[in-house]
């Protein structure tokens, strides 16, 4: 609008790179008005990435795009929570705690939108399957521009056998074919012209859900989701093999539920206990639940979408940290991790 252009003119003239928060309609226009300057999307909606990256690729003046946001955070509570009970976002709804709009959730787990972004950037050639929560099928939910879809990469929905399910496949290919237990559910167009997304509707049936990319009739990639078995196990992975005795160094312990074959179980819920002894302390423990009321320094948390995350901090003296982790009701399956703490 001419009035907006007039208001922005003074600040635009004073900068070499013009940055806009959410004014994405001006990215190309500013480049035309100021041909010797560059434009940058300094804060944009996650769901707009397919459209905005096309703008970046089509103009030498548009440098790139920063989404809001990469990692979830405490505050602006409820901005991205999917309400199915009539509540509105940004409504100060207790017990909302996090914004819940990060490509990566508070437990460090990548949400589906991050894989869509990876595909849009051209960094991933395999398709990616995300299933809209089957237990919420047909229910109306609130939504803000910071939200994409309430979906997760899971084909484990106990108790919902035969119930309708919506499957989204993110893909840069011309076509995507979806298979359920070897049976084709059809092919659909994908790629840039369709927002890098193809959606299928089926009914939940335990087994294997597989998506296949086709470019010019040739297969270019696959992605599959498998239903987790009934036995629920806990997998724990530490991101550090040793720490420095500086009172600050951290080791993050990622925990997720899985079956005996290692298939992630995002639908399962278990309470996890952690005990830290020796040359370090428990810095924090928690999950990505945006409405949890538990304390982040508590030694017991429930998984959320199958995941939890703990941070162990080294003390100021060399030695060894002993971390013991177990699921409630399965105390006999305790896992012990030893982390050496060496000199600074």
Give the ranges of each region predicted by the language model.
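Extended low-complexity, serine/threonine- and proline-enriched intrinsically disordered segments
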Residues: 175-183, 269-283
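Exposed beta-strand face motif in extracellular beta-rich ectodomains
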Residues: 205-209, 251, 317-321
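Short beta-strand elements
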Residues: 222-229, 333-344
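Conserved structural position at the C-terminal beta-strand
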Residues: 213, 257, 325-327
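Substrate-binding clefts and catalytic carboxylate motifs of secreted carbohydrate-active enzymes
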Residues: 1, 9-248, 260-265
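Short, hydrophobic beta-strand segments
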Residues: 198-204, 297-316
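Short aromatic-acidic-glycine turn motif
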Residues: 188-190, 232-235, 275-291
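Short acidic/polar inter-strand loop motif in beta-rich domains
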Residues: 215-220, 328-336
């Amino acid at each position: 609008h001419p009035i907006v252009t007039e208001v922005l003119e003074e600040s635009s003239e004073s900068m070499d790179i013009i940055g806009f928060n959410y004014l994405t309609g001006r990215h190309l226009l500013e480049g035309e008005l100021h041909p010797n300057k560059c434009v940058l999307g300094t804060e944009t909606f996650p769901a707009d990435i397919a459209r905005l990256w096309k703008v970046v690729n089509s103009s030498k003046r548009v440098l790139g795009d920063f989404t809001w946001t990469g990692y979830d955070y405490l505050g602006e509570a409820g901005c991205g929570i999917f309400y199915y009970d009539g509540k509105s976002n940004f409504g100060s709804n207790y017990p909302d705690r996090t914004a819940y709009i990060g490509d990566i959730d508070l437990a460090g787990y990548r949400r589906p939108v991050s894989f869509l972004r990876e595909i849009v950037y051209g960094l991933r050639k395999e398709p990616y399957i995300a299933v809209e929560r089957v237990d919420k099928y047909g229910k109306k939910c609130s939504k803000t521009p910071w939200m994409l879809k309430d979906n997760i990469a899971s084909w484990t929905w106990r108790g919902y056998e035969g119930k309708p399910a919506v499957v989204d496949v993110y893909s840069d290919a011309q076509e995507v074919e979806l298979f359920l237990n070897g049976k084709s559910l059809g092919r659909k167009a994908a790629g840039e012209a369709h927002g890098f997304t193809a959606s299928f509707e089926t009914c939940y049936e335990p087994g294997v859900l597989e998506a296949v990319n086709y470019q010019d009739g040739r297969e270019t990639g696959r992605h599959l989701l498998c239903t987790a078995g009934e036995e629920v196990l806990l997998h724990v992975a530490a991101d550090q093999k040793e720490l420095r005795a500086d009172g600050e160094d951290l080791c993050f312990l990622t925990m997720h539920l899985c079956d005996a074959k290692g298939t992630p179980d995002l639908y399962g819920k278990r309470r996890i206990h952690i005990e830290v002894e020796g040359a370090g302390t428990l810095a924090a423990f928690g999950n990505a639940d945006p409405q949890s009321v538990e304390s982040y320094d508590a030694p017991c948390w429930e998984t959320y979408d199958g995941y939890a995350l703990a941070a162990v901090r080294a003390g100021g003296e060399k030695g060894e940290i002993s971390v013991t982790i177990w699921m409630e009701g399965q105390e006999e399956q305790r896992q012990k991790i030893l982390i050496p703490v060496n000199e600074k």
